[in-house]
């Protein structure tokens, strides 16, 4: 009888132990998020503020959010002050003050991200899907031995995300089942930045320990220079109005007419890959799957046929106006307003009717 009781107790203990392990596995993991931010002119870039909005979508109540900035000089510290009051969820701003991080080279930044992750133990790491984020995230993920989730457009649960596939023609829901951290890049056009807080709440600013840096930290790449257009027009990725030209404009000279319209509207100028490949405009103006992803309030397309790769980069625009003499052009399938006409006649009429921007 005693043996039966002891056996039952042993079986009960074993079952209870298994249940406790199962229960432990089912417990929700604590959420903490590291946002890798970019800055310019002493301010956090809008794309990084969108990454903060994505962090809020992961968890609002129990989410410890740290924001990582790198670089050197007064601009970095001014940006850190801006970051400290940029979002109510930001609990700490981490600053890596070194000339090594003054330029967006993936090798030293990946080492920095690995070091910060090892010390912070974050459950999530977020970067915006900019050229910098796309370059950094895979390398850092490889160093941390995890698989990144890219181009996230929506967050359903802390580890369930939606991302576009097939050039934006389908949406895929993915669940991250790997080890921490869950690393992801987000489309900034899909997450609206939160308005700046009052100065009443300011997160502390902490210097990152850079003792991990060595002479080989810069890797096999070196910064050469940065070339940018000298223009007063807004940045293409964040402009509220975008005027885009395609191969139908026929020449670089005709793109100047489009630029006149952009000046009247206070808009950014974009281009299709065909226009870029033809040499009409530089490639930094390319909108599409392999160019800039935009979602302005107003998107005007002149002489754009609507190739699938181009539509992937602008289909989230609030209002789309298309002008093309081909009534069967695919661009009309996504346009809110379509004009089947000669684009040069339409441009001429618009330039006559629209007042100059003050």
Swiss-Prot record:
Keywords: Electron transport, FAD, Flavoprotein, Mitochondrion, Transit peptide, Transport. The gene is ETFA. Its main location: mitochondrion. One of its GO terms (biological process) is fatty acid beta-oxidation using acyl-CoA dehydrogenase. Belongs to the ETF alpha-subunit/FixB family. SUPFAM superfamilies: Adenine nucleotide alpha hydrolases-like, DHS-like NAD/FAD-binding domain. GO terms for cellular component: mitochondrial matrix; mitochondrion. It is found in: Mitochondrion matrix. Heterodimer of an alpha and a beta subunit. It comes from the Eukaryota. Binds 1 FAD per dimer. FAD binds at residues 298-326. Pfam families: ETF (PF01012), ETF_alpha (PF00766). This is Electron transfer flavoprotein subunit alpha, mitochondrial. CDD domains: ETF_alpha. One of its GO terms (molecular function) is electron transfer activity. The electron transfer flavoprotein serves as a specific electron acceptor for several dehydrogenases, including five acyl-CoA dehydrogenases, glutaryl-CoA and sarcosine dehydrogenase. It transfers the electrons to the main mitochondrial respiratory chain via ETF-ubiquinone oxidoreductase (ETF dehydrogenase). Its cofactor is FAD.
